[in-house]
Regions:
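C-terminal regulatory/interaction module of P-loop NTP-utilizing enzymes
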Residues: 1-148
């Protein structure tokens, strides 16, 4: 890394949601969506791990819920899983609670009445049905349909 830094010039390129200002999917501003997620990522992780606007550029030509869902399932979710080491509670804080389902696990139900010293816990799973629903994306912004 040090040798590369001595030989080359590096310029910081932060996400630029402004290039998505004219992109909306079913009335939802993609620029606002990206900005909101990145503010949360900056607080929960750091600004160097914010999501780049390039992921959303295909929406300029094809601003559909199907394309947005594809971007989230193929790019955004795996990226957040990597950033947060599959800490789904933090991923839920970034995306709201529509995309990640929480299942409460009762240790007695799971293991019977054995004398097991376990606390009840929870497991997480991706709610793939949410990706096709524009309201799931609106929930990231904490707004209802008529407020976007």
């Amino acid at each position: 890394d040090t040798a590369l830094r001595r030989r080359f010039f590096f310029k910081e390129m932060l996400p630029n949601p402004d290039v998505l200002a004219d992109v909306s999917v079913k009335g939802l501003s993609v620029s606002n969506l990206l900005t909101h997620m990145n503010k949360r990522i900056a607080v929960l992780y750091d600004r160097e791990h914010t999501i780049g606007h390039a992921y959303f550029m295909p929406l300029k030509k094809n601003p559909t819920i199907k394309k947005l869902a594809e971007i989230f399932t193929n790019n955004i979710i795996p990226l957040l899983q990597e950033y947060f080491y599959e800490d789904y509670e933090k991923i839920r804080l970034i995306l709201g609670n529509k995309f990640i389902a929480v299942n409460t696990v009762n240790s007695n139900d799971l293991f019977g009445q054995e004398d097991v010293d376990l606390d009840d816990g929870c497991s997480y799973e991706i709610n793939y049905a949410a990706f096709d629903d524009i309201e799931s994306y609106r929930s990231i912004l904490n707004v209802k349909e008529n407020e976007v």
